[in-house]
């Protein structure tokens, strides 16, 4: 099967936004215009195509990033719809990793909102080129110029309009294209037909000023054009488009468009802008990877290069089982072929290859460089794994996911639910790298941990709906951590003699703080005093021991361990003995190393009308919060702070009550910090250690 669309005519794009900016509605309109759906589904009616999970349709928010393929003006779009709620930031993170460009959707009344800032930061980390669509221009209070200003003020990004809306609120009727200096009026019908009109005289001067500014900004990205501009030459439309495109692909300049997806205004022009300005797979830098020799190499977006891809999402499908979504960076993959999961060093067979449209699927024979598809039959592949040609091994840069910050206990309602619950939890954990599940050694309870209360609510809900498992849920609890503040050295010696063959394990380990670097293991044993096999066992034993800290039983983080000495017994040494010896060394050294309890600190942003500003400031301070600043947003104030998570339970209700429902907040994990002594003592006391 030959490639239908060239790499130049391929766009891998994401749609990203704050919750309620109209992102899913915008995606729906895109799918309608690109011929993928025949009846538009409205999010507020629970009929949206991309929001295909039952929970998403009930709550009207997008939880998992559904991938779909669509076509526009001889260009193939692979579109990923991403969630706007902070608890699902991991979905955004993994989508951005495999995309070439994105459309950031803003609310025309609010401009840049807190979650927009979070998603924008993530996109900047991955240098994803973006265009901005200011949506809801029909909404009361919509202000296009204000929204554009917030991009510079709040995101520090260089943005300029390439359109100017004609009218606003209920009088929003069309736009002026500032690149071509033409005006268009929309008919507001689902087909979104528009006709060219004269530029309204009351907007002509403003349009000319904005175009002059656009030209000034754009020519900076093309040296020849800049010289021509400085010499007073006229910049043609095609030259201007080319310069804008260069700035966008550089992830340095962000053109802004206007519209109202719900009212069928401006989405077709947005599609044209995706084709004109966002990059194809060959416009962006080639992906880098590591060869088995340790050498760094590039893989170019080309069908003739060896196959390489990144698995970015795993889902359990009720009909076909485990689906692995992947982005092909180079080469071609044919169904039925064998590939290597180089991350796990395991061979995998690709049973079927599916092209996805939300939760519908089309089976295809092969996928090409630059494509996004889903595979059936990959048994051992998880999110972030590299898939490649067996004869041309490479490991691509993986994804880093935040640690869960909130946990709760889960109990099956009946004996029949017990077995189903463990199957359901393992499948859900396989899908979502920020969701963890484990059994508490002391209580025997099943614990689930995630990024927020909504995240865990939806996990419990999915267990009930998809796996038919009924559970009793405990109150949410904070996931504390432990660490050490001083270095220490200890010996762990495990000797057990019981009749015949005994057990012998002996290690000497030096420990030291390893702030913000996680666990690190260094082997400094010389002369073969302990074999590599037993050194590895000691490492495994130590990692297991670190899962249950020494003062309150919470996982210990940021510890560097160097094994410096030890010994073996020619008959009695075994792997288990070295695992136990390493954990004994940790317990022995722990008290000397000033172990402390760490608590999660959250970035909290509260937006309230001016009259509640003082109340909120006082309230945050009473929660051990550190105020970092505030800014005026219209007639409201946004207060930025860092607050311990333990103080934030039930905050939504609290904020609602003292602002009469007029305040809102967002909360995102920032870092772990040492808990004050009084708090730590309370945590240790509760743990019963």
From Swiss-Prot:
GTP binds at residues 17-24, 81-85, 135-138. InterPro entries: EF-G-like_DII, EFG_II, EFG_III, EFG_III/V, EFG_IV, EFG_V, EFG_V-like, G_TR_CS. PROSITE patterns: G_TR_1 (PS00301), G_TR_2 (PS51722). Keywords: Cytoplasm, Elongation factor, GTP-binding, Nucleotide-binding, Protein biosynthesis. Its main location: cytoplasm. CDD domains: EF-G, EFG_III, EFG_mtEFG1_IV, EFG_mtEFG_C, EFG_mtEFG_II. It holds the Pfam family EFG_C. GO terms for biological process: ribosome disassembly. GO terms for cellular component: cytoplasm. GO terms for molecular function: GTP binding; GTPase activity; translation elongation factor activity. Catalyzes the GTP-dependent ribosomal translocation step during translation elongation. During this step, the ribosome changes from the pre-translocational (PRE) to the post-translocational (POST) state as the newly formed A-site-bound peptidyl-tRNA and P-site-bound deacylated tRNA move to the P and E sites, respectively. Catalyzes the coordinated movement of the two tRNA molecules, the mRNA and conformational changes in the ribosome. Belongs to the TRAFAC class translation factor GTPase superfamily. Classic translation factor GTPase family. EF-G/EF-2 subfamily. PANTHER family: RIBOSOME-RELEASING FACTOR 2, MITOCHONDRIAL (PTHR43261:SF1), TRANSLATION ELONGATION FACTOR G-RELATED (PTHR43261). This is Elongation factor G. It comes from Mycoplasma capricolum subsp. capricolum (strain California kid / ATCC 27343 / NCTC 10154).
